[in-house]
Amino acid sequence: MKKLRVCFWNTNKNENINEYISDIIVEQEIDILALAEYESDIEELKKMLALYNIVIEQAITIGCDRITILKRKANIQPAFQNKYCSMQIIDNMYLLACLHLPSKLYADVLKRGIAIARIVEEIQIQEEKLGIEKTIIVVDINENPYETGCLGASGFHGIPVYKDTMKKYRVIMDESFKMFYNPMWNLLGDFSFPPGTYYYSGNEVENSFWNVYDQVMIRPCLRGQFVDDELKILCETKKRKLIDANNHPDKKISDHLPIVFEIMED
């Protein structure tokens, strides 16, 4: 059975990030890599990967400067694009929405909510237009799974328990809201390491320190193809660590840690 392996990483504008990206693509056998804040040299990365007989191409993301998508799969076509979102059609079977939403420093929950509502609307338009139900979201949402944009019915509606998503939608105030299944809830907290993808030590009254800002969400129909054990937050490669001496994301590399997941294809 074929598999689709995807990685998402906010590379924090690090111009020297390519050696880390190369390690991840090789070791994790990545088919599609979605990057936020990528400002390194793609041609340099291609040469690094060529040493392993790996050929990558850049997907078309015109209209979305915040996302760079690198692919090893040939059959990927662009769909809707805007400032915060690049949608891609994979094998005429999956709709992949790659997002980088604004930071809490520059947009409050209401502003982010406007951007999210527009994207959710467009996802449903594309699903209907293309006849695709197998939608995957990969995102640096700058919110945790339990916050409004992720969990709210008018947001991504990312539910932590698959059984509750089997009915596909909820009716609230006489309006139907489709659901996503969000497996990232399982990676919150210190039962496993790392406890999140982003660390922030501030003096706000409410501060969880570790955050899961980088997430994957899937439509419930994909649950059977989602490989639980392959959902990972990476904190190292075989050659290099991505965390510092305090076990926090090494900001000299990136202030975010990458996530990896796998879909078993039909």
Over which residues does each language-model region extend?
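Active-site beta-strand/loop signature of hydrolases that rely on acidic residues for catalysis
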Residues: 5-11, 21-43, 96, 119-151, ...
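Glycine-rich, phosphate-binding/catalytic loops in enzymes
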Residues: 24-25, 49-52, 113-115, 153-157
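Acidic, histidine-bearing metal-coordination/catalytic regions of metal-dependent phosphoesterases
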Residues: 1-3
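Structured beta-strand-rich core segments of catalytic domains in phosphoester-bond hydrolases
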Residues: 32-104
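Short, flexible loop segments at the rims of nucleotide/cofactor-binding pockets, characterized by
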Residues: 9-14, 113-114
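Metal-dependent phosphoester-hydrolase catalytic domains
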Residues: 128-131, 145-266
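Surface-exposed cleft-lining segments at the edges of enzyme active sites
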Residues: 101-116
